[in-house]
Amino acid sequence: MKRLLIVFSILIIPIFIFLFVGKAPISDDITWGVTFSSNYAIDLGLDWKEAYLEILDDLSPKRIRIATQWNDLEPEKRIYHFEDLDWQIEEAEMRQIDFILTVGMKTPRWPECHIPYWANDLNKEEQQEEVLTFLETVILRYKDHPNLIAWQIENEPFLDFGVCPWYDKGFFLKEIDLANTIDPDTPKLVTESGELSLWFLGAEIGDMVGTTMYRQTWWHKAGGFYAKYPIPAVHYYRKALMIRKIFDKDVIVVELQGEPWGPVPTFILDLKEQEKSMNSEIFDKNIDYAIRSGFDEFYLWGVEWWYWMKTVNNQPEIWQKAKKLLR
């Protein structure tokens, strides 16, 4: 038993020190972007186009990750509604803002899997065929846009999170192969949980890895409670270092927490409850933490909420802080 403990210590302690001890070098050239979901803006009761233009013009992000939903783009089988997405891309390109386009069955914002009603009752194989057809249609439409810097295929495809009918790594590989066949020149971004993964699968499959970075979230276990991840900033840097050394792939932060994560959706959550997981002070701490992680590209999560706080609740503090950061 004693010998086993010694062997265990010899193996585990160096790994622990590597992943959790020390400081990351701070980048002196950080690119800040945002993620935007028109559906989330609508959930907050906003005029989503007005909010989007204000984000582009007042915050002036250098990059934007545009979240799409299958049920919006193909509300009826083979009948596509691209007008709103066309408009978002045109407005970004008019301002020379680069964009990442998310596409797939599972994309950002709850319930994660956004399946159109006509595909709900299809079996798994039939749904997968429809996803591939949808994916091909979207990539063919947008692949030649000059400001498109990456395709994000699905959202955290290896994480069992959200209301989804299935998870299938083999099918995800088919999606990536299809995307590479149609548009071999644009990098394919594969996203993973920053807190619950080492990112090896994403790095093996994608051209680059996108990670989340959440600090304060609501856990539904044991009756529910707020929890702060006990992870030092250097942890993300060291994992990214492994990815670069082993796979020669870059890692960026695609979701840096900038809004509340409470027991119910934010748009029905009491303001006082929202402040438990996001307020002006927490926002500052999250930005400081992100900088100390050593990364040089971040996409902030919650820009629609900042606009809602500013315009509906007359609390512009986080919007103003983000404005200074993004410009």
Task: Label each region the model flagged.
Residues 106-110, 131-166, 299-300:
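Active-site groove signature of glycoside hydrolases
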Residues 32-36, 64-66, 99-103, 149-153, ...:
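Hydrophobic faces of well-ordered beta-strands that scaffold small-molecule active sites
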Residues 1-16:
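N-terminal Sec-pathway targeting helices
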Residues 186-266, 316-322:
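Glycoside hydrolase catalytic-domain groove-lining segments
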Residues 49-120, 163-190, 204:
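Aromatic-lined substrate-binding rim segments of carbohydrate-active enzymes
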Residues 42-58, 130-141, 193-202, 279-289:
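Short, acidic/polar
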Residues 149, 250-326:
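Substrate-binding cleft of secreted/luminal carbohydrate-active enzymes
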Residues 17-62, 67:
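Boundary/entry segment of secreted carbohydrate-active catalytic domains
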